[in-house]
């Protein structure tokens, strides 16, 4: 049996996922990054003082692989040390932590990855998110969600024809994540849709856009070839 947290705090509320979660769970707490900066533990601790919080859904992150290649220290501050701060806060509050990670933690050489498969990132963005996972694993009452999502309308004129993914529209992912939050599960959980190329995903999402093909060889940053996810545990524990 599942139930909603008494009080849910969401980090990264101004982002794509945050806006989608807010529409589904408007009674949760969505502090802005200016008042709840994950790189500033003292500020976070002051903000939660006097508030009853039993679950933190941590999605605040620096998520652009090419920009992280240019500025890896910012990724260290936000994605690794910021997550360490959130872990510390949850320990102090005795709150459950649900951490939004990425399918990119996998090497991408075969796809259909299970939760217990070996992780080996191919770019700095994914290494920084894996660093966050390592911090979260120090908590007993925590859940790591590996997923991939994008806007409800595909935003680009081209998409990778040679990269395989389990990506879903953010509105779908937000609902799936909240069901995972409400489940009370701990450990690692994969959240995603069917295995398909990013191009097939884009064309299914936005057929009127006539998205054209792009190759991973055409971009300057490293892209894993197949990070599709096995979601058997999600379907078994939570449902479709």
Give each language-model segment a name.
Residues 2-25:
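N-terminal Rossmann NAD(P)H-binding glycine-rich loop of SDR-like oxidoreductase domains
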Residues 39, 70, 74-85, 119, ...:
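Glycine-rich NAD(P)-binding loop of the Rossmann-fold in SDR/ketoreductase-type enzymes
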Residues 176-226, 230:
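Mid/C-terminal beta-alpha module of Rossmann-like enzyme folds, strongest
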Residues 26-47:
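Adenosine-cofactor binding site in Rossmann-like domains, unifying the SAM/SAH pocket
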Residues 120-148:
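Active-site Tyr-X1-5-Lys
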Residues 141, 147-154, 164-191, 196:
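Alpha-helical substrate-binding/gating segment
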Residues 84-120:
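Conserved Rossmann-fold NAD(P)-dependent oxidoreductase catalytic core, especially the SDR/UDP-sugar
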Residues 41-78, 89-91:
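NAD(P)H-binding glycine-rich loop region in Rossmannoid oxidoreductase-like domains
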